[in-house]
Each structure stands twice: as C-alpha cells, then as structure tokens.
C-alpha cells in the first residue's frame, strides 16, 4: 500500500469504515489528497485527527456525502427557503456489508448532512434512540433535532426494512413538500396549486 500511495496524486478510500482512519493518515502524511467514502471514520476523535492533519499538510479531504450533489435535493433547496419542520426517512433492506458501524453512520449520516445544509442555525438539542436487531451495532434509529431558530427535524433510519425508502417532508408557511429520492420526484402543496417536479425535476403543474 505504501508504494501505491507514493505513486498516486490522490486516493479514493473505499475500505470498510474501521480502516478509513489508518489509510487516510498514511496518505496525508505523504501529502496526498484523499476522497473518503462516508462515514469519514467510526468516531469523532479519528475524524478530528484526519481533519487537523489535512489542514497542517494543506491537503484536500472530501467525504462521500453524495446527496449534496443530488439534483433533486438542490431543487428542493430552491423551493424550501424557510422550513419550520422537516422529516426524513431513509430505509433499506438488511445487508451484512456496513454493519461494522451503526445505522446512524451508515445511512442517517446523509440526512444529518442534508439537515445542516438546509437549516441556517445551530443545533441546540438532540434526542435519539435505536436498537440492535440483526447485527452487533444499531440497525434502526430515530433522532429528534432542534435548532436555535426553532426549526425541528425528525430523522428515521433503518437497514432492516422490507423495501428501500428515501423520503423528505418539509413544512413551512403555506407550503408542504414531499420529496421521493427513489423516483426522483418533488410534490409541492400550497394554497393556490399543486406542482410535481420529476424526471430530472422538470415542473408539471396540476390544476
């Protein structure tokens, strides 16, 4: 691996999460930029060490939070400017891969990233619960997040569901949206009309 790092300009780390820290540190010590699949590491101490080393080495570290670049998500952010309440549901059938970390780091991490990008305020309170069902780590989890500006977010993630579900519901004054990332589609409900954005988020108005 050392030889591979030495001859590379940048590296993409796609190993199981418990190896991310060790490999990333080796790359950064040799002044290599890295792209790390989510989650960055299995704990905050290791993540902090990677970030601090990257800063000191002036290297780039990017984590694979791919939903940031989802065109449906970007369209939703254009529509929803001042959300008061957000619900996100991310469910998947069980797979042994990825169970070395809890479902919060395996799936919900995407939605935590989205919530932070949608709400321009600091988090003031978090309540969470979860359960181990089919692995040695938490397989399903709920999180209730409250922001300083009063926005509330409820997140639900499970990797023991029957089907894949990726849904976001937002509520703001006179506007309610349902976003299905599996289709993808955004339904918009307001006082005057209903609109649906689908097929790469092209608007279709319903009279």
Walk through the language-model features, giving the residues of each.
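Conserved SAM/SAH-binding loop
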Residues: 1-2, 90, 131
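Beta-loop-alpha module in the N-terminal Rossmann-like domain of NAD(P)-dependent dehydrogenases
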Residues: 1-51
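A short helix->loop->beta-strand "cap" motif at the edges of active sites that frequently abuts
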Residues: 30-32, 56-60, 151
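A contiguous active-site-proximal alpha/beta segment in oxidoreductase catalytic domains
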Residues: 41-98
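Mid-domain beta-loop-alpha active-site segment that forms a flexible
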Residues: 64-71, 94-123, 138
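Contiguous beta-strand/loop segments that form the cofactor/metal-binding neighborhood of enzyme cores
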Residues: 112-185
